[in-house]
């Protein structure tokens, strides 16, 4: 919980200290909703980290697994290349990237002022991914150390 609060504080500093003043970013949506969805994304990525840590045998392997997990997740998120411009097989892979759903929700909230009535599918998908990966990580952790 403490690390989640640190990440949320860093997000707030970046949002209000950098993006707002430097780029004159118009924040149109609910900041409470944005931070709740950010906390859900942190939960999902913590699950990925826990799962990677239980698969690896040492810290060096965790570092390598992090690159192997994060690079495709970033490339398939839609941040650099729109999902619509990707081939069909890459679009399917983008569905398993929690970053794709987080960016969809964050853009919707901050730039468009969208509410949960239009973002529920992205939030639900990210939540399901979070429960799956965190559950898998906890299961592996329990078998290894329990």
Over which residues does each language-model region extend?
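Short cytosolic juxtamembrane segments of multi-pass membrane proteins
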Residues: 139-146
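Membrane-interfacial helix-loop-helix junctions in multi-pass membrane proteins
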Residues: 26, 78-132
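Alpha-helical transmembrane segments and their short interhelical loops
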Residues: 1-67, 71, 116-123, 127, ...
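A cross-family signal for key residues in well-ordered alpha-helices
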Residues: 66, 94, 142
